[in-house]
């Protein structure tokens, strides 16, 4: 297994699909990485040379991925909560942030139903 950005990439899958195993790299980004490095997206990782894998590593390193991306997202959410803005309050209360209705639905965000106390 090749290791790119601290993630073990599966050998028996196509390059584009394997790159999506990295947090922060989707299909579109993986295709762009393959295009800039000149690697054929249909070739499997096990068939790539060490030089090509190094090129992929270098190109992936230009993007914010894995732990850095997770940290960045959490810091942005924390900043909203510290500001006390509407979106921050919604995050703090565990409710939908982007204007969805909550009278019905929103069960995923709110969690399981709580029984009514008498």
From Swiss-Prot:
| UniProtKB keywords | Ribonucleoprotein, Ribosomal protein, RNA-binding, rRNA-binding, tRNA-binding
The yes or no answer to whether the keyword RNA-binding is present is yes
GO BP annotations listed: translation
Region annotation (Disordered) maps to 93-118
One cellular component term (GO) for this entry is: cytosol
In the record, the note on similarity to other proteins reads: Belongs to the universal ribosomal protein uS13 family.
The UniProt entry, under PANTHER family, shows:
30S RIBOSOMAL PROTEIN S13/40S RIBOSOMAL PROTEIN S18, SMALL RIBOSOMAL SUBUNIT PROTEIN US13M
Binding partners and assembly: Part of the 30S ribosomal subunit. Forms a loose heterodimer with protein S19. Forms two bridges to the 50S subunit in the 70S ribosome.
Briefly state the protein's biological role. Located at the top of the head of the 30S subunit, it contacts several helices of the 16S rRNA. In the 70S ribosome it contacts the 23S rRNA (bridge B1a) and protein L5 of the 50S subunit (bridge B1b), connecting the 2 subunits; these bridges are implicated in subunit movement. Contacts the tRNAs in the A and P-sites.
Its recorded name reads Small ribosomal subunit protein uS13
Q: Give the species this sequence originates from.
A: Pseudomonas syringae pv. tomato (strain ATCC BAA-871 / DC3000)
Please name the taxonomic classification of the source.
Bacteria, Pseudomonadati, Pseudomonadota, Gammaproteobacteria, Pseudomonadales
């Amino acid at each position: 297994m090749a290791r790119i950005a601290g993630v073990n990439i599966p050998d028996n899958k196509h390059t584009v699909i394997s790159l999506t195993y990295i947090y922060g790299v989707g299909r579109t980004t993986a295709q762009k990485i393959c295009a800039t490095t000149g690697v054929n997206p249909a070739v499997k990782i096990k068939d790539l040379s060490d030089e090509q894998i190094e090129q992929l590593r270098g190109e992936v390193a230009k993007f914010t991925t894995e732990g850095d991306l997770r940290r960045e997202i959490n810091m942005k959410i924390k900043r909203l909560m510290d500001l006390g803005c509407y979106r921050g309050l919604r995050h703090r209360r565990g409710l939908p942030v982007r204007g969805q209705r909550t009278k019905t639905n929103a069960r995923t965000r709110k969690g399981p139903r709580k029984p009514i106390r008498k």
